[in-house]
């Protein structure tokens, strides 16, 4: 019916006009800013500052931006280009390699200060009276939905900014990745210029940090994958390194004398990776999207010894969608074989977007946000092979959706041929409530085999709009039915039943961060089964015979004033091979909470309650 309707419409002209026909300058819309080195630096500075002023406190706004830099050098050691990055802002170089775009200066994320209801910039509130009054309660725990990629930063100490001109600051929490970045100079992952500076990140991949030790500081947890370090200062609860040159040595739990309270989970190589696709300009000034090749047992960056292996797709093969485009038009483009670029904005979808064909690329610029309007999934990936999705937010809509993103049509139809050309989901984030009321039974369902999940945050909102136990309802953040699925950096929080269900064999998860729901109104309302309190955060199905997990943590903060308990943070088959799970932990987050987690995994490991707040309860390996 849908295909017949589409074919009945004269589509050739609209599609041709919306596919990129000008190699020099495709129309990415008004919220994609493209800078080049010939522009006056004052003009660039004014533009990026204006975006930051709007976005730095715009947590649940509808504005979205991409700031793109053509190959060349920006700023100098005496006149650095320095600017903050706010919500829903992606900053990226347009070179084929990170060294093609050089920023002399810094691109920063600072704490937000909540002392007087306003947001901090350079350690002071924008609208403080009198000007310059220091703020209190400054932290990075809500610094979400922003990104930095594909460029080099030569960090320049900018004395005009005071303390916050002393480093490259990336004080973020979830959904704020760094990819394909080289930083020469001091990098800090927390803002030490104002306190208490809590931070709850984070994700780095395919990046290098040279000339200084990366400051982890207060970051509770972090995953760094396939990168190169000159040093790393410390751990807090769950710092994970996979395929990282210069990573700290394996040391878990942090309470061991040899660890010095620095817990590190370190894997020498990453089992299977495929870096995220990215937009770039070639030497002839033509736009392309680069698709990196699959790697096995890899270590370090893909660009250390030359250009990243892979292939290019010319921009003419992409349909460049705008938020005002109807879903049928975007689907028509996908039906006719176009790849898809989603430009910044909010897309209200009255039907699911369907990626039909193998090797389709769907690339988001500036955190495009998809919201289903009729209880439909926002997107269905129909092919099991080589489909890549990157840089997209999936919001729940006003009518309950069974799932927001479905990857693969059949959870029991296994396809080994996809192993050489796996699908990948990169920097894809899910949200139930917060920005607006919404409901969805499940957020992400992966039916295809061999899929790579690379930085996923599925969040049932604990603050914002439409938040409440019976308001933003959502059972499960991630269900994996496919075999040999690999996850790096899975952040899944506050769902109302199992937060992750892993049904497929041969799976691997490297890093998991979870907060259980804050708001169960009673123990009776939150029971896995009679006699089993609560729900496990991560459930490996009873019929699974092979699964590996590394660096997996779950935290509790039940804030309804009644004792709520979860019997286990993790439930897995006892028949898994020995040491299938490694470096597990639970945390009781705050003495203002109640209840807690009674066991780490399958009835062992001890409890996290008010008796041991902010103290990891650990299991080194299981079974």
PLM region descriptions:
Residues 80-84, 99-142, 159-174, 187-198, ...:
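Glycine-rich beta-solenoid repeat tracts in large extracellular/virion proteins
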Residues 1-18:
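Fungal secretory targeting signals
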Residues 87-96, 140-156, 175-187, 199-211, ...:
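Right-handed parallel beta-helix
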Residues 33, 37-90, 96-108, 323-329, ...:
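N-terminal extracellular ligand-recognition/capping segment immediately after the signal peptide
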Residues 240-310, 623:
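Extracellular/surface-exposed low-complexity segments
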Residues 20-46, 295-327:
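Right-handed parallel beta-helix/beta-solenoid
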Residues 593-623:
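Eukaryote-biased recognition of C-terminal alpha-helical segments
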Residues 28-42, 88-164, 318, 323, ...:
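Right-handed parallel beta-helix/beta-spiral solenoid domain characteristic of secreted/periplasmic
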């Amino acid at each position: 019916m849908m295909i017949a309707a589409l074919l009945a419409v004269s589509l050739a002209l609209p599609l041709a006009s919306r596919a990129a026909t000008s190699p020099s300058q495709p129309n990415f819309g008004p919220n994609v800013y493209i800078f080049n080195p010939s522009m006056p630096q004052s003009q660039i500075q004014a533009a990026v500052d204006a975006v930051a002023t709007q976005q730095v406190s715009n947590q649940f706004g509808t504005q979205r931006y991409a700031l793109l830099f053509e190959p060349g050098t920006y700023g100098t050691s005496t006149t650095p280009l320095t600017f903050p990055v706010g919500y829903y802002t992606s900053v990226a170089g347009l070179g084929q390699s990170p060294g093609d775009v050089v920023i002399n200066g810094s691109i920063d994320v600072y704490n937000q200060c909540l002392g007087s209801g306003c947001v901090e910039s350079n350690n002071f509130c924008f609208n403080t009276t009198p000007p310059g009054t220091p703020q209190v309660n400054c932290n990075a725990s809500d610094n979400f939905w922003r990104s930095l990629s594909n460029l080099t930063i030569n960090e320049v100490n900018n004395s005009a900014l005071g303390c916050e001109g002393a480093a490259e600051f990336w004080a973020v929490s979830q959904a704020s990745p760094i990819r394909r970045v080289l930083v020469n100079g001091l990098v800090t992952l927390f803002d030490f210029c104002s306190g208490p500076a809590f931070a709850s990140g984070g994700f780095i991949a395919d990046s290098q940090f040279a000339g200084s030790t990366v400051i982890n500081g207060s970051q509770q947890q972090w995953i760094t994958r396939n990168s190169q370090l000159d040093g790393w200062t410390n751990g807090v609860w769950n710092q994970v390194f996979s395929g990282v040159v210069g990573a700290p040595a394996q040391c878990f739990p942090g309470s061991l004398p040899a660890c010095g309270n620095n817990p590190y989970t370190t894997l020498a190589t990453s089992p299977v990776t495929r870096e995220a696709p990215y937009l770039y300009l070639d030497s002839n000034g033509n736009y392309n999207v680069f698709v990196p090749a699959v790697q096995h047992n890899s270590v370090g960056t893909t660009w250390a010894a030359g250009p990243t292996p892979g292939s290019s797709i010319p921009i003419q093969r992409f349909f460049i969608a705008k938020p005002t485009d109807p879903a049928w038009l975007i689907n028509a483009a996908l039906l006719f074989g176009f790849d898809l670029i989603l430009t910044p904005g909010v897309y209200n979808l009255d039907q699911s977007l369907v990626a039909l064909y193998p090797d389709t690329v769907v690339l988001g610029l500036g955190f495009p946000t998809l919201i289903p309007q009729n209880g439909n999934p926002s997107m269905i990936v129909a092919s099991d092979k080589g489909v890549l999705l990157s840089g997209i937010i999936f919001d729940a809509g006003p009518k309950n959706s069974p799932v927001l993103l479905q990857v693969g049509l059949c959870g029991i139809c296994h396809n080994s041929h996809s192993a050489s050309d796996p699908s990948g989901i990169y920097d894809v984030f899910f949200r139930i409530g917060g920005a607006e009321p919404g409901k969805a039974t499940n957020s992400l369902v992966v039916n295809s085999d061999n899929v790579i999940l690379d930085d996923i945050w599925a969040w049932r909102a604990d603050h914002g709009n439409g938040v409440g136990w019976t308001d933003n309802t959502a059972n499960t953040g991630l269900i994996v039915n496919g075999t040999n699925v690999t996850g790096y950096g899975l952040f899944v929080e506050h769902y109302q039943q199992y937060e992750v269900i892993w049904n497929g064999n041969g799976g691997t998860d490297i890093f998991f961060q979870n907060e259980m729901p804050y708001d169960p109104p009673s123990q009776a309302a939150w029971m896995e089964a009679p006699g089993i309190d609560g729900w496990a955060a991560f459930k490996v199905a009873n019929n699974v015979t092979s699964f590996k997990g590394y660096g997996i943590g779950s935290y509790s903060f039940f804030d309804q004033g009644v004792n709520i308990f979860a019997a286990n943070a993790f439930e897995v088959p006892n028949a898994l091979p020995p040491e299938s799970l490694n470096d597990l932990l639970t945390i009781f987050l705050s003495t203002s909470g109640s209840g807690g987690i009674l066991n780490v995994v399958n009835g062992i490991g001890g409890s996290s309650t008010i008796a041991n707040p902010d103290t990891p309860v650990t299991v080194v390996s299981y079974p």
